[in-house]
C-alpha cells in the first residue's frame, strides 16, 4: 500500500494535480527544491527532504537525496523481517512511491551556447540513483519517470485501496532502466564527442562511443526471408515525418520487406514539394519503378503506373498529398501491398474498407532529417550523415555547347531528384513529369542504361527528347551513347571522371545538352 511518496521532478507537467490526488488518498508527500516550492504554493502539505532527513542540501544542491533515510526507505524489502527491523531500528519510514525525472541534459547540450561546465552541471546524480533504487525494488515500490503514467497509477490506486499491482510496477521499472540507460548514453555520447580543447563548438558529429536508443514496435512473423526472425524498432529520436511515426489505419501486420520498401517510397515522395503539385512513387524491392507528378493524386498515380505496370504489381505506393476518393478508386484496381499518404479522405477509407488486406499508413509530412544513416557490417557499424543534399541552381554547370531548353531543364531536375533514390548504378529516363525507364542496381552503368531503355520500350513509352539522370559520372562515352541512341536529348550527371572531356565531346558531337551537378548520389 502506498502511504508515502517522494516527488522530485524537472518536468512539472501534471505534478500538482497528481500530488493533490495523492494527498486526497491520504499519502504523505516528500519533495525537494523547486518541486516542493510548487506544491507548497499550490496549498499542499509537503515535507522538504532536508527536513525529513535532518540533513540540509549542500554543494549547491548537488547533494539532496543521497541519504540512508531516503534510500533505505526505498530499497528495503517489505517481505524480509530483517530489512524492516533495520528500518525500525533507525527510524526510517518506507517510501512507497517515487516520482522523479531528470535534469534536462540532452536539451542543454543541444544548445549552441552550451559549455562543458553547463553540461556537467546538468548531469543528474541523485535522480538516477533514486530511480534505480526504486526500480530495483519494484516489487514493493512504484516508480514513475514519465508524467504520462500518472493517470494509470492513480486509477489503479483508486481501484485497489492505494495499492499498485506487480505487473504495473514491473512495467514502470522497465521504463526507468530504459530511461536511465538512455540518459547515461547521452552523457557518454556528448563527452566522447568533445575535442582536445573540450569546446562545445568543436564537437565531433561522431563520438568515440556511440550509444543509440530504440524501442520495439513489433515482432514480425519473419524477416527478409521466412527462415529469418525479425523485429522493428523505432528510434527514440525519430524526426517529424519519419516512416517510424506511421499510424496504420487498416490492413495486415507490416512485414520486414513492407517496412523496408515503405521507407524507400516515403523518403522519395517526401522530396517533392506538395505545394508544387501531387507526387506519386511506386516502389518494388526498394527501387522506384514509377515516379510522377501531376495536378492531382490520381494524375500522378496514373503517370507513375505507366512507367512499369508489370513491376508495380504488389508494390508499395506513396503520395505526398492527401489521398482522395477519386485517386483511391483508381489505385484500388491494382494489387498493392502498402499505401502511404499524409492523410486519407473518408471516401478513400471507404474504398479500401473493401480491401482489408491493403495496409494504409498515414504519416504527416515533416521536414526533419535523421542525424545518421546506418549500415551494419560484420562486427561493426558504418555511420554517415544522410544524403539530404538537394542541388541548387547555382551549382548546376552546363558543360556542352548546347544549353537545355526550359522544358529540358524541368525534366532534368525531375530525373535528378528520382535518380537519388535508385540503387546504383542508376540511370533514369524522364519526360513530362514522369519516369519513362529506370535502370537500377547494375554493376555496369552502361547495362543500367540499356535496361532503362528496354523497360521504356516494353512499356510503350517514347524516349525521343527525353532527359536522363545518372547518379554518378559516366566513366566512358559508351553509357552516354546508349541513352542518346535510345532518344535522350539531354543528360544530368555529377561529372568528375578522368574522361569527362571525352564524354563532353561525345555529347557535343551528338548535339546533346549536358549538365554537371558536382554531387554524386550513390545508393547501396
Curated annotation (Swiss-Prot):
Q: Which GO terms describe its molecular function?
A: IMP cyclohydrolase activity; phosphoribosylaminoimidazolecarboxamide formyltransferase activity
Query: Which residue ranges does the record assign to the MGS-like domain?
Result: 1-145
**InterPro entries, alphabetized:** AICAR_Tfase_dup_dom_sf, Cytidine_deaminase-like, MGS-like_dom, MGS-like_dom_sf, PurH-like
Per the UniProt record, which EC number(s) apply here?
Answer: 2.1.2.3, 3.5.4.10
Quote the cellular component terms of the Gene Ontology held in the record.
cytosol
Alphabetically sorted, this entry's keywords are:
Hydrolase, Multifunctional enzyme, Purine biosynthesis, Transferase
- Output the Pfam families linked to this UniProt entry: AICARFT_IMPCHas, MGS
The biological pathway it contributes to is: Purine metabolism; IMP biosynthesis via de novo pathway; 5-formamido-1-(5-phospho-D-ribosyl)imidazole-4-carboxamide from 5-amino-1-(5-phospho-D-ribosyl)imidazole-4-carboxamide (10-formyl THF route): step 1/1; Purine metabolism; IMP biosynthesis via de novo pathway; IMP from 5-formamido-1-(5-phospho-D-ribosyl)imidazole-4-carboxamide: step 1/1
According to UniProt, the reaction catalysed is:
(6R)-10-formyltetrahydrofolate + 5-amino-1-(5-phospho-beta-D-ribosyl)imidazole-4-carboxamide = 5-formamido-1-(5-phospho-D-ribosyl)imidazole-4-carboxamide + (6S)-5,6,7,8-tetrahydrofolate; IMP + H2O = 5-formamido-1-(5-phospho-D-ribosyl)imidazole-4-carboxamide
Query: What SUPFAM superfamilies does this protein's entry cite?
Result: Cytidine deaminase-like, Methylglyoxal synthase-like
> What's the domain of life for this entry?
Bacteria
GO-annotated biological processes: 'de novo' IMP biosynthetic process
Looking at the UniProt entry, the stretches that span the membrane are: none
Q: What note about domains is in the entry?
A: The IMP cyclohydrolase activity resides in the N-terminal region.
* Annotated family: Belongs to the PurH family.
This one is known as Bifunctional purine biosynthesis protein PurH
